[in-house]
Amino acid sequence: MLLILATFEVTGRMVLDQKDSCFTGLLSSEIYENHDSSDLKKLCDDYAKMIYHDYPNRHLAPNQHTDTVNINEHGFRGSEITQTKNENIFRIFLVGGSETYGMFSTSDKTTFQGYLQQKLDTLDTEYEIEVINAGVNAYDSFDSAYQIKTKLIDYDPDLLIVVTGHSVGTPAKEVNIDVPLYYPISNEFAKLKLYYKSPEFFEFTKRVILKNVYGDQGVPGEVIIHKNVEDNVKIWKNTWFEICELGVERNFDVIVAVPPVSGAGNKIPTSWELQNLEKLSHTSIVPSYHLVKDTLRDLDKKCANTVDLTNIFDNETGTIYLDLTHFADAGNMLVAEELFKLSLPFMYEKMGK
C-alpha cells in the first residue's frame, strides 16, 4: 500500500509540473508576460496550498502565509487587523468569491482590496480608511450573505462592497449549519496538501476522466441551464434585499456591484479570450446576464448603491480575462478604480465632509 501511495505521489508531482491548468493557462495566455515562469508556478502552487474549512460554510483557515498570499488570524486575505474598531477608522469590506479574493493576483496588494487600499491611502483625511478582503474562492450569494450575517457584522463595518451576480447560472446552495462529527479530522486531513501533491493530483485525474467520458462541454454540473436562471436571479435579489435591510438596521451601507464577464461587455477579445469564449461557452452566463443587470433597478430601492461593471474593460486591447470570469492584476486595478469612485460619497458622508 505504501508503495502504491508513493508511486501515486511521484506520478502526481511529475504530471502536475507539466499539466497544471493554472500554470499552463497563465503561461499560454501571456497575461503575465513580464513574469518568469517560476513566478507563475509559485503563484499557482500558493493558490493550491490554501486550506479551507467547510463548516458551517466554506471559509479560509486563519494564519496561512506563502510568498504571494497571506491569510490573517481572522481568516481574511491581507494584513492583520483588530476586530474592535477605533472611532477614527472607516472600515470597508469587499465581499465576494474568487475574483474578490484575487485568485490569480500576484500578491495581496494586487487584489481589488489591495489596489483600493492604495488609492484610499492617498486621501487627505483624519480618518484611517481600512479595506478588508473578505472574498473566498467558490462563494455564491448564499455563502456571502451568511458570512455577512454571522461574521462581518461583528467587525463593525461602515461599508460593504459586494461583487456578485455572475454565479446565478447555478442554483445557490443553502448553508448547512450542522457540523458533522468527523469535521475536526477532515480539517487535519486538509493540511496534507501542504506537503503532498496526491490530493491535487486526485482532483486532476478525476477531471481528466470526466472530460474523457462526457467531453469538454458535458461535464456534469458545469453546463448553465439558462431556463433556470430567472428563478435563480429572484433568489439572488431577495438575498441582497435582506442584506441591504440589515445594513440599514446596523448602520452600514451596502453597494452591490455586478462584475465584468468575458463577452458581456464590448471589449474586443484577444485570441486567448476568443478561444475561451468558444471553449467555455457552455459555462457562460452572458446569454442571461441581462436578467442580473436589470435587477439592479430593484436593488437600488433597498441598497445604498448598485453598479454594473460589465463595460469597464471595453477600451482594453490586451488580454484581461484568463477564463470567462477571472482576470489578473491589470483587471483588478481597473475594478478597484471604479470601486474607489463609488465608495467616496459614502465615506465623506460618514466622515462629515
What is the role of each PLM region?
Residues 99-107, 133-134, 229-233, 282, ...:
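Second-shell loop/turn segments in exported
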Residues 7, 12, 236, 296, ...:
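Histidine-centered active-site loop/cap adjacent to the catalytic His
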Residues 4-21:
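Membrane-interface motif at the C-terminal end of an N-terminal transmembrane signal
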Residues 165-297, 314-318:
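Serine-dependent acyl-ester chemistry module
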Residues 22-119, 123-124, 316-317:
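Membrane/wall-proximal cationic-aromatic binding patches
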Residues 89-90, 127-129, 155-160, 248-255, ...:
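Loop/turn elements at helix/coil->beta-strand transitions in domains of secreted/extracellular proteins
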Residues 91-94, 119, 127-155, 160-207:
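Internal alpha/beta domain cores that form substrate/cofactor-binding pockets in large enzymes
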Residues 14-17, 103-107, 143-145, 171-177, ...:
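Short, solvent-exposed loop/turn and secondary-structure capping segments
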